[in-house]
Amino acid sequence: MITMSVFATAQDIQTATAFFDQVSARYGQIEDYAADVTVSSEDRLSYGRLFYQIPNRVRIDFEQPSGQVLVSDGEVLQVYIPRYNVVLQQALRRRSEQALATLASEQGLNLLRANYSIAFLDSPDPVELDDESDEMVVKLLLNWRSTNEGYRQLILSITPDFMIRRIVGVTANYEEITFDFVGVETNRGIPDARFEYEAPASANLFNDFLFEGEG
């Protein structure tokens, strides 16, 4: 069992960026992971099972919306929306590939370090995750250095083993989106085939739904 004594490192480290680097180093030990993920905003709630593999493969099998799938093999992003029987497909540019991995790898966290200012939200002391939970976390506040970033502000809640438990992001349009990660299992040897996806043949395909493909 992980005890609260682990959190002493947060207090011993004098700067938030140094603590953030501990989180980045922890993710540097991870080849892959699976977790239950919930994404919520003021008017939307979705949840499902997340699979991640370095450097930039990701898949979410959604329970809500039921049957929806988001998958990227690092080169192509696909989103299957069964409600409309459509597949949205996007050939990824380099920056978009990085965006998928931003909060799931040592490299991605280093990108955040370069593009955001980092501070403790209130102090380096552990606090409850929220008013309804006694789970203890250290909270970091990240503010964008450039308006080119997708989120103007991020609040990262970090567990005693230096894993991200929750991300609260504020978009450029001031929309707040919360990502919760529960039951994280690391280095499971997730096969490459997990990130291969063939949508139903009857689904309508829409290419380049984010931006025009390159080449």
Where in the sequence are the language-model features?
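Extracytoplasmic
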Residues: 30-34, 45-47, 55, 65, ...
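Short, surface-exposed linear segments at secondary-structure transitions and domain or protein termini
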Residues: 57-59, 96-104, 163-166, 186-192
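Extracytoplasmic segments of membrane-associated envelope/inner-membrane machinery
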Residues: 80, 87-123, 137-141
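Gly/Pro-enriched, hydrophobic low-complexity segments
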Residues: 114-209
